[in-house]
């Protein structure tokens, strides 16, 4: 048997226009990417936020995919859920990670899921052979799932951190 882990979810997207006061400090947090864990479900990322006055715009984290254990029958493992966003003028969800699968023919074939993408880059690709998951390649994207053998423990790919872009208009 073997196991194909799902990919991690991508982070959400938010866009907001604020009227601001020059020389004023504003609060922000840039979210971290989730991390792959050897032999366990992936860790969630953290949210990116930007606060002006009483309004906090949040691009929420993508979740890690659950652990994929060895299977001897046709099996699918869920990918992580993409993050949502709140309080933006435009709010978008991160893409869900795709599931990993185990196909049973003469010998098991394992395929891991790709991570969820974002507007700012490419996710970690899925695998079609036993190996550790691929790391994400763009801001706010999820890592690819690991593909395991019958007794081999593997680690999912890491997600990428979020990004905050501030455009100033006069």
Where are these regions (language model features)?
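A generic short-segment signal for beta-strand/edge and adjacent turn/coil regions
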Residues: 18, 28, 128-136
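Glycine-rich strand-loop-strand elements at beta-sheet edges
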Residues: 1-52, 143-166
